Amino acid sequence: MSHQSTINFIRFTFVILSLLAIYTILIPSIRKGFFQHITECEVTGKLSRSSGADARMIESFTGVPVLDIFVKALVTSFWPVINGENPALSLLGVPAVASMGVSYLLLLLEARRTRSLLSVTWRLAWVGLLQTNFSQAIILPIYCAIAFSSSKKTNGFRPIPHVTISLILCVYTGMALVALPSPAVIPDGLKQVVVAFMVPWALWVFVMVFMASYLFPIEVEKEKSRRTIYIFALVIAATTHLGALLASLLHADLGPADVFLPPLPWYVTRFPSLEEGMASFLQWDYLIASVTLFLWAVAVYLRDCDEHVDWQRFGLEVCAISVIISPAAMAVLLIWRLDEMLSRRGIAKED
C-alpha cells in the first residue's frame, strides 16, 4: 500500500470516527438519560455524594446566565469523576484530561510550522473550547480532517516559547487540584471553581502564550526547545495512561476493562445514574479521541517522511507501543521522530 493510499484512508476514517462519536456519545446521552440526570442536579442545586452530605452547587460562576448554563452543566457532568467515589471514573479522568492537552500541543506544533504563533494559538483556542463544551471525540476528528487537508508538506520545527508552562498552569495544575479528596483536603466549592476555570483552558493558554511572548521575549534554541516540548508531551501522555492502567490492575475490584473499555450502545437501554452516563461518555470520548490523534500522527508522518516504510514492522511497532503507553503517547513519538528526520534533512541540505 502506498503512502498516499494510506493517507486517503485515514482522511476517510476521520469522518467515520466523528460519526461514531455522535452515535456512541451524543445520541445515547440525549436518549438514555445522561443529560436528564445533569438537568435534575441543576434543578435541585445539589451534587450527590453517597458517603456524607451532598455538595451544594455554586449558583453562579461567571455572573453571565448564558455562560453559567454551560459551566454548570460541565461541573455537574464531571462531578462523578472528581468526587472520588467512583475509582474507575477517577482513574480514567486523569489520562482523558491529560491527552486533551497533549493533542492540543501536537496540533499546535504542526500548525506552527507554516503559520504565525498568534494565528495558531487563537484558532486552537476555539477548537479547545468546542472540545470541552461538546466532546473531544466529535470535534477532534473534524478538525484533524480539515487541518490535514488544508496543510502542505513542510519541514522544520518552529519553537513555541512558554507553551509548556502555560499548559501546566492552565490544565495540569487544575487537574491535580481536582484529584485531591474533598471535602477533607479541598472544599467542594473550590473544586467546582477549579473545574469552571478549566472550561476555557485553551483560551487561557492563548492569552498566556501571547502575553508572555511580548512581555518576556526570549531567544529559544531550536534543538533544546524541540527536545523539551516532546519530552513534556510524552511524559504527560504516557505516565497518566500507565498510572491509570497499573492502578486498575492493582485495584481489588477493578480491571483495565472497567476503566478503559466503553459499553456498546445497544446494550444500554438507559443510564440509571449520572455516574453511569458519565462513565460511558468519558470512555468513548477518550478512546475515539486517542485513536484520532494517533491516526493523525501516522498521516502526518507518512506525508512528510521520504524514507521507505516497512508496513509490517511499522504497524506492529506502533500498535504494540500504543497499547502499552497509549495512542496519544505513540502520536508524540511519531511526530518527534518525524521532526528529528526533518532536522537531519535540513542540516544535510545546508551542508
UniProtKB/Swiss-Prot annotation:
Its EC number is 5.4.99.-. It comes from the Eukaryota. It is found in: Membrane. One of its GO terms (cellular component) is membrane. It is an enzyme of class 5 (isomerase). The keyword Transmembrane helix applies. GO terms for molecular function: isomerase activity. It is a multi-pass membrane protein. Pathway: Secondary metabolite biosynthesis. The chain crosses the membrane at residues 7-27, 62-82, 89-109, 126-146, 160-180, 193-213, 229-249, 281-301, 316-336. Keywords: Isomerase, Membrane, Transmembrane, Transmembrane helix. Belongs to the membrane-bound ascI terpene cyclase family. Epoxide hydrolase; part of the gene cluster that mediates the biosynthesis of the polyenes aspernidgulenes. The carbon backbone of aspernidgulenes is synthesized by the HR-PKS sdgA, which accepts acetyl-CoA as the starter unit and performs malonyl-CoA extensions as well as regioselective methylation and reduction. The resulting nonaketide offloads the HR-PKS by intramolecular lactonization to yield the 5,6-dihydro-alpha-pyrone-containing hexaenoic acids preaspernidgulene A1 and A2. The FAD-dependent monooxygenase sdgC then installs the first epoxide on the penultimate double bond. This is Terpene cyclase sdgD. The lineage of its organism: Eukaryota, Fungi, Dikarya, Ascomycota, Pezizomycotina. The gene is sdgD.
